[in-house]
């Protein structure tokens, strides 16, 4: 099974990236193929186009996306839209910031997975 992890990359807390990397390593040790954006995409891309292309290719192979949602991450919004459009199973793992009472993508993910 192929799993794509949606998480913040740019401006992400390095300690949090380390924790998420451990999650990816654990999934790999269980036999899953995992796309972890901080490690599996060329972060030195000056325009971001190559990053988007690499993510799109990985997303097309994904059976599931596991989401560590950070509402401030623009890349996470982009990736979630791809997953939703492709009809990939969305697994909400953690919401990085408290969610208010209003509509939100986190609530959409939780409702769609339930």
Residue ranges, per PLM feature:
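Conserved catalytic or regulatory cores that recognize and/or transform ribose-phosphate-containing ligands
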Residues: 1-114
């Amino acid at each position: 099974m192929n799993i794509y992890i949606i998480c913040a990359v740019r401006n992400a807390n390095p300690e949090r990236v380390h924790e998420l990397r451990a999650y990816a390593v654990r999934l790999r040790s269980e036999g899953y193929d995992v796309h972890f954006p901080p490690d599996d995409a060329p972060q030195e891309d000056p325009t971001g186009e190559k990053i988007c292309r690499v993510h799109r290719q990985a997303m097309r192979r994904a059976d599931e996306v596991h989401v560590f949602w950070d509402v401030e991450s623009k890349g996470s919004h982009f990736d979630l839209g791809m997953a939703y459009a492709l009809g990939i199973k969305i697994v909400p793992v953690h919401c990085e910031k408290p969610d208010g009472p209003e509509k939100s993508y986190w609530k959409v993910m939780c409702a769609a997975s339930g």
